[in-house]
């Protein structure tokens, strides 16, 4: 009931106040070329206002569908909207991706990149994602409560080095501790929901290892909340940060 009311109000604002809404959404959905990617009055003068407004209307469509969608109606990760669009414009076909936690993001990366290896602990999600039978997407079911750490150490089961390692599942700090050795020299680590205090040990560890961070705080895709997605990178990284 509340969600539907909010959708109606947002839709009304869209049709009745396009000029003011462009300014608001330009703050919420800034251009990926602005590395700060946060609210700023200066962004109001950004020439990419129409692009920001387009992204905002896409966000409204995602909320209506209750899943994150791109402009073509295809699934996208449930990251912060700013991070989602940033990735959409910078991913390359030759990239290899590893995910701790499968989902709509797995389908998105499979469309954009060379290969995706995803670890999942939930049987239902595992069956849902594997049912798509995508050739360049491999999903593996791992025991979350194993004494041997089967889930967080699963990345060592594979010989590959990865351009992107996405930490968006369970035991995120432990996953972060394990993933550096499997990252290419120009690789990037993505931590979703990075605003949560419980992930501070993992973030501090990466900073101690010489990684810089790019935080993207914006509305969450398909949700009426704000969230943060952080990219941990080094000089000369594959996303051009």
Name the predicted role of every residue range.
Residues 100, 121, 169, 193-194:
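Generic detector of well-ordered alpha-helical packing
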Residues 74-81, 145-146, 169-170, 223-226:
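Conserved phosphate-coordination/catalytic loops
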Residues 97, 118, 166, 190-191:
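Generic enzyme active-site microenvironment
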Residues 164, 170-241:
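C-terminal substrate-binding/active-site "lid" region of AdoMet-derived donor-dependent transferases
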Residues 1-74:
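Membrane-proximal basic amphipathic "stem/tether" segments
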Residues 143-156:
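Surface-exposed interaction regions that form or flank ligand-binding interfaces
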Residues 78-146:
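SAM cofactor-binding core of SAM-dependent methyltransferases
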Residues 154-164:
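A short acidic, Gly/Pro-enriched loop at the edge of an enzyme's catalytic core
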